[in-house]
Amino acid sequence: MKSIILTILDGWGYSENKKGNAIQIADTPTIDKLWNSYPNTLLNASGRDVGLPEGQMGNSEVGHTTIGAGRIINQDLVRISKSIEDRSFFNNEAINSICQKINFYNTKLHLIGLCSNGGVHSHIKHLFALLDIAMRYKIQICIHAITDGRDTSPYGSKIFIEEINNQIQQFNHINICTISGRYYSMDRDCRWARTEKSYNTLLKNTLGFTKDPILMINEYYKKNISDEFIPPTRLHKGSIENNDGIIFFNFRPDRMRQLVHAFTKSTFKGFNTTSFHNLEILTLTQYDPSLDIEVAFPAKKNKNFIGEIIAKYGLKQLRLAETEKYAHVTYFFNGGIEEPFAGEDRQLIPSPKVETYDLDPEMSATKLTESAINAINKNTYKFIVINYANPDMVGHTGNLDATIHAIQKIDKCIKKIWLACQAMNSTLIITSDHGNADYMLDENNEPCTSHSTNPVPFILAEPTNIHTYHLRKNGNLADIAPTILQLLNLNIPNEMNGISLLETKAKNKI
C-alpha cells in the first residue's frame, strides 16, 4: 500500500485572469510541471458545494471540514440562518434563558462578535436576530462590535456600524459600547497582548475620544488604520460586571476561543484576568467542548470522517501545519473532534511572531517542509496531511508583492516534497481549501483581502503509473476523501456522499 501525501495549499484558488492574481504572476515551475504532467482537475470550494449559501466564498474551516468529511455538510452559517428564516431561532431555549436571567437581576446583556456580512466567522443578521429576542425583555444591551476588514473590504465597517445604529437609535437601553478590530479581539496565535487589550476594554469604563462610532472610525481611517486594526475603544459605559450575561455570536470558534477562555477558564494564564460572580456566558456554537458554558446551537455529531476510517484500518497518519492552520488539519479535519484518533500523530510548527505576515511571507514553510520530508522518509505513515498557510495568511494582508513571494516559496517547498515522494514511491496530492491569493485586486483596483469563490486545483502525482488514472470534472472538496480511500484500496463509508474523482470503477461502500 502506497502512502498518500495530501498537501493543502491554503488560499490557492484557480483563475486564468492575471490581474491581481499572485498565483498567475508568480514563477511556479514545479507546480506548473506537475499540473501539466499528471492527472488534474478543478474543484468547487464555495457556496452550496461546501454547505454554504449560494455565492458565499469558502473558508479554511469549511474547506478542511468538507475535505475530511467526504460529504457536503450544512455549515453553521446556513444552519443558524435557516433557523432565523423559519423563526425557530426566536424560541431558542438557551438564548431566551440568558435574557430572562438578565431581566431578573436587572443587569446587562453583552453581545460580542464580528459585525459584518463576511459570513466566514459571523453574520450581522445573526446579531439583529439576537437583538430582536433581547429587546422583548426590555433589558440593557451592550454591543461590543468587532470590525472586520479581512473577510470584507479593509475600510467597509462603517456600513455595518451604521446598519446597527439604525436598528438601535430609538432605544435608550441599547448602545454600541466598544469597537475593536479583529486583530485584537480575534487572535488565535496566543498573541496575548492583543487579546488582553480587547479584554481590558470590555471591563473598564474609560471612555474614548467620542461616543459617535462613525466619527471614531473616520478618525482611525485618517491615520490609515483599517477595520482589522482598529484599537479597542470604548464609546459608552457598560462594562462587564457581576450578574451580567454575555453572548458571543461568532459561529466559527477558532478566533473567539482566546477571548472566551479569558472569561471562563480558571486555569487561564495568558494575562491577568478578573473573577466574576454569576457571570452567564453563552456562545452561539460550541467553541471548546472542555468549557462548561451554554451553547445555543450545539455541534451535530458526524462520524466516519477520513481520519476515523484510516484509524479503523489500523493505519498510522500524521497532521502537519504551522500554528495558524493547526486547528484546521486536526479539529476541523476530524469533524470537530479535539482528540486525535488512534495512530494519528500531530506536529505543530510555530508561526513566526510578526505583526502581519507580509513582513515574513515565507512564514514557517521551510521548517514545515523539513518536518514533512522527515515524515515521508520514515515511511511509517500511510496518510499525511500537510497545510501550507502562506497563500491565505499573506493574501489576507492585501500585499500583492509579498503574496507573490509566498507563492514562489511554496513552489520551492513542493519541489522538495515531490522529490521525497518520488524516493519513497509515495502519492502526492496537491489541492486547496478555498481561493484567496488568486484575487487580490477588486474591480476598482483596490487591495482585496478576502477569499475568492474561484475553484481550486487538484493534482494527483504518482511517481509511477502516470497514465493509470483520469480525473473527472465538476467535482468539489467532498470528493477528495473518497478519492484517497479508493487510492488506498479502503472501503468508502456510506456517510461519504462525495464521489471519487477517479474515472474507474468505484470502490464498494460500507
UniProtKB/Swiss-Prot annotation:
Subcellular location: Plastid, Chloroplast
UniProt-annotated binding residues for Mn(2+) 1: 392, 396, 451
InterPro entries membership: Alkaline_phosphatase_core_sf (IPR017850), BPG-indep_PGM_N (IPR011258), Metalloenzyme (IPR006124), PGAM_B_sf (IPR036646), Pgm_bpd_ind (IPR005995)
Top-rank taxon, per record: Eukaryota
SUPFAM superfamilies: 2,3-Bisphosphoglycerate-independent phosphoglycerate mutase, substrate-binding domain, Alkaline phosphatase-like
Cofactor: Mn(2+)
Transmembrane segments: none
Family to which the UniProt record says this protein belongs: Belongs to the BPG-independent phosphoglycerate mutase family.
Protein name as annotated: 2,3-bisphosphoglycerate-independent phosphoglycerate mutase
Organism placement in taxonomy: Eukaryota, Rhodophyta, Florideophyceae, Rhodymeniophycidae, Gracilariales
